[in-house]
Amino acid sequence: MATLATKKATLVAALKDLQRVTVAFSGGIDSTLVLKMALDVLGRDNVTAVVANSELFTDEEFDKAMSLAEELGANVQGTTLDYLSDDHIKNNTPDSWYYAKKMFYSRLNDIAANNGSAAVLDGMIKNDENDYRPGLKARSEAGARSLLQEADFFKTDVRALAQELGLTNWNKVASCSVSSRFPYGTTLTHDNIAQVMAAEKYLRSLGFPTVRVRFHNDIARIELPEARIGDFLVFNDRVNRQLQSLGFRYVTLDLGGFRSGRMNDTLTKAQLATFA
């Protein structure tokens, strides 16, 4: 297996070949490492960071990503995407994330064409080759590059190099689109999205940074890391009251704990194979 130094060298060589790039930037550790390395290798004038603002991510996440890109010294621009204008996304179909990523990559390609970039870069890593990843198909169709994935970076590699480079978010908890909180086939609205976002914000304020509130109409199913379930029990009453005030009739705690991609358990083998 290649060492971290070897993987870093592969990443540097790939960046040098591209000369000028546009980076899809979310503020997460993966895209932060891509942006930092691009800036170090190519210089500020040859790198543009793009942050998407949409209904599926919080305003707080957008603002933090914009600020972080600026702190890193990047030329950064925000772009607004109306994901709910696409019926596949609005109806949360099993392939909805393909259409969401397709919309984003299309916007990124337009921006890259305008600034003369040789490529659009994202933060996908080797771990992203597993599970159900419709975003991989959208990326391939758009011609975007995942240099971390190409250089065999796993999450442990990303965190190690990010820490080595002094990136403040090297151990940041991963986040993802709020659509992942809804069962496939659930119609996404501004109201139920806001309901879930408010519930998760409240739970994070209690000291649970890794949390998911899965939406099942009038039922909120809370997922936490199994090691934190015991800590959570002292907050039962206040959490129940707060989430009921947000519109949930029943508030439940999933004893199976947190697991990313949980909603994909309902997909058939044929559906999973669509984007394999």
Swiss-Prot record:
EC identifiers of the protein: 4.4.1.37
InterPro entries reported in the protein's UniProt record: LarE, NAD/GMP_synthase, Ni-pincer_cofactor_biosynth, Rossmann-like_a/b/a_fold
Keywords carried by this UniProt record: ATP-binding, Lyase, Nickel, Nucleotide-binding
Residues carrying 2,3-didehydroalanine (Cys): C176
Inducing stimuli: Induced by L-lactate and repressed by D-lactate. Is thus regulated by the L-lactate/D-lactate ratio. Makes part of the lar operon (larABCDE).
Gene3D superfamilies assigned: HUPs
Catalytic residue positions: C176 (nucleophile and sulfur donor)
Phenotype caused by lack of the gene: Deletion of this gene leads to a loss of lactate racemase activity.
Catalyzed reaction equations: pyridinium-3,5-dicarboxylate mononucleotide + [LarE protein]-L-cysteine + ATP = [LarE protein]-dehydroalanine + pyridinium-3-carboxylate-5-thiocarboxylate mononucleotide + AMP + diphosphate + H(+); [LarE protein]-L-cysteine + pyridinium-3-carboxylate-5-thiocarboxylate mononucleotide + ATP = pyridinium-3,5-bisthiocarboxylate mononucleotide + [LarE protein]-dehydroalanine + AMP + diphosphate + H(+)
The UniProt record lists the keyword Lyase: yes
Top-tier EC class: lyase
GO molecular function: ATP binding; lyase activity; sulfurtransferase activity
Function: Involved in the biosynthesis of a nickel-pincer cofactor ((SCS)Ni(II) pincer complex). Catalyzes the ATP-dependent incorporation of two sulfur atoms in pyridinium-3,5-biscarboxylic acid mononucleotide (P2CMN) to yield pyridinium-3,5-bisthiocarboxylic acid mononucleotide (P2TMN). The source of sulfur is the enzyme itself: Cys-176 of LarE is the sulfur donor, thereby being converted into dehydroalanine, and is not regenerated in vivo. Thus, two molecules of LarE undergo sacrificial sulfur transfer to create one P2TMN. Binds nickel. Is required for the activation of the lactate racemase LarA.
NCBIfam families assigned: ATP-dependent sacrificial sulfur transferase LarE (TIGR00268)
Family recorded in the similarity comment: Belongs to the LarE family.
Protein name: Pyridinium-3,5-bisthiocarboxylic acid mononucleotide synthase
Organism: Lactiplantibacillus plantarum (strain ATCC BAA-793 / NCIMB 8826 / WCFS1)
